[in-house]
């Protein structure tokens, strides 16, 4: 089990990372802003264009500290990792399964978990806020998601599965405006938009999914899997397809719940966004800092894992699933148990 230490988030776009002996040093315009012993850091997420010194990159690589770079708006650019953990036999088996008919079984499990967890969030929200939502719409979407779960298990190929997943996602998005209980004008949701996000809700979702993808990619590589070879998401240069597969299980449970909690508690407001002339919307520097501060706290919340029945900190969940996936690929488990609440 990977120990959860601390992830260092650099939110200002003029920060520069360097190294002084055993310390990670943050500089701004040549002035030292802060320093941290590398032993207490397990990951660095940088939203800066300035980058990092070769000595800092070497320190991270030698000590398995994941270092990822994002644009100030949160779009993932790239990452540095040290020597690959795990053994070549695991990856060879992963590649065989990804190219074989069995890949559909893994893909089905990722998507079944995605739809199931979306449905569970819907039902929980309906239970807690019955007086403030369109219960008829919720029941209608619940029926559609239940049907989609049945169809996922009957899908015979990835194209069929892709169609079912897309229909289920569209149904789920129909109720997003009902998830907003505070400042509905600012947080009006008009459908999922990416690159760029075109409203405040999409800006929050995209930022959260980017962070979650980083966590999932780190988890997969920590157990020795190739995060770029997936089962549901097809291979594409530069795309961490297996990380995106794993993200599907956690979208609703980790990111969606968190985003609507921020909105409904008034922890993120209109002033935390930047509205561009082309219609795109991004979190401001202050908005990113608020999001990340609360995200970091959320990571330490404990939940009971549905398969192991043990208490697990929230952001250790991708590591547990990565371990279970590796066991399934090795043949130590009869099948992969996805994260389903």
Task: List each model region and its residues.
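Active-site helix-to-loop segments that bind/position phosphate- or nucleotide-bearing substrates
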Residues: 1-20, 27-29, 35, 87-228, ...
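Terminal-proximal segments
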Residues: 1-72, 82
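A surface-exposed, charged beta-strand/loop segment in the N-terminal or early-internal portion
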Residues: 48-120
